[in-house]
UniProtKB/Swiss-Prot annotation:
EC nos: 2.1.1.197
Domain of life: Bacteria
InterPro entries: BioC, Malonyl-ACP_OMT, Methyltransf_25, SAM-dependent_MTases_sf
Record-level Gene Ontology MF annotations: carboxyl-O-methyltransferase activity; malonyl-CoA methyltransferase activity
Any Pfam family matching the protein: Methyltransf_25
Family, as annotated: Belongs to the methyltransferase superfamily.
Gene: bioC2
Name the UniProt record assigns to this protein: Malonyl-[acyl-carrier protein] O-methyltransferase 2
Keywords: Biotin biosynthesis, Methyltransferase, S-adenosyl-L-methionine, Transferase
One GO process term, biological-process aspect: biotin biosynthetic process
């Protein structure tokens, strides 16, 4: 799989976190539940499902427990995370694929549901990613995803956090690609820590410490949070989107 140097840095950050991710992913689990809740209330086809950026399989297991399916694919481009996912779902019939969601993993018009929990912030070209996913969905297929929005990690210095989009800018991208928007919501989640160092360790423990456009060739610095903060909170401003492929 050919990836550029930036993708390699993202891979490296997540592969390093393969054995710590699950212990520090309480926020990610809750976000996944919140994304699934309205989706389960909709009457959608779930025969063939793809869980992109599946990580250690937390989201894949939640999807498998929520919907009847014929084929469920778990896709990630970090090999060590996929190994963890396979271990978590070894009793299931889930198929695992080592691939990047920014490539065309599946044939056109082949998927009923695409699910992605907290993965698309790592897309280098989100609009092109949406075009690719649109083509892989069947007519009236559904795309459901959560993604950090502007305001996430606001406690970090500007040079120590990645740029995030607004809810409205993502809505505009989806509509420009051709999706019909079913829901677009945003919620705030917070995680508290005893010290700034513990907060930074939590980010590194889930592999989210790779800066997409660093001023220096490194990830988070040891103290990106103001030193006068003794009781530290990290904010997750999350967008939840469900969209349908409409053929004109």
């Amino acid at each position: 799989m050919m990836v550029n140097s930036l993708k390699k840095r993202i891979q490296r950050s997540f592969n390093k976190a393969f054995d710590t991710y699950d212990d520090h992913a309480s926020i990610q689990r809750e976000i996944c539940k919140q994304l699934l809740k309205p989706l389960k209330e909709m009457r959608i086809q779930t025969k063939i499902i793809a869980d992109f950026a599946c990580g250690t399989g937390i989201s894949t297991k939640a999807v498998a427990d929520s919907f009847p399916y014929q084929n469920l694919y778990a896709i990630d481009f970090c090999e060590k995370l996929l190994i963890q996912a396979k271990s978590k779902l070894k009793e299931s019939n889930v198929e695992f694929i080592l691939a990047d969601f920014e490539t065309n993993v599946f044939l056109c018009n082949s998927l009923d549901l695409i699910f992605c929990n907290m993965g698309f912030q790592w897309a280098l070209d989100l609009k092109q990613t949406f075009f690719s996913l649109f083509s892989q969905l069947k007519a009236f297929g559904v795309l459901a995803f959560s993604v950090p929005l502007l305001g996430t990690f606001c406690e970090l210095r500007n040079d120590c956090r990645n740029p995030f989009l607004t809810l409205q800018s993502i809505v505009q991208l989806l509509k420009a690609v051709g999706f019909e928007l079913l829901t677009a919501d945003e919620k705030i989640f917070t995680d508290s820590f005893e010290s700034p160092l513990d907060a930074i360790r939590s980010i590194k423990s889930i592999g989210a410490n790779c800066l997409l456009y660093p001023k220096r060739n490194k990830g988070l610095s040891p103290m990106p949070i103001e030193k006068n903060n003794t009781d530290t909170t990290l904010t997750y401003h999350i967008g939840f989107f469900i969209a349908k492929k409409i053929i004109q």
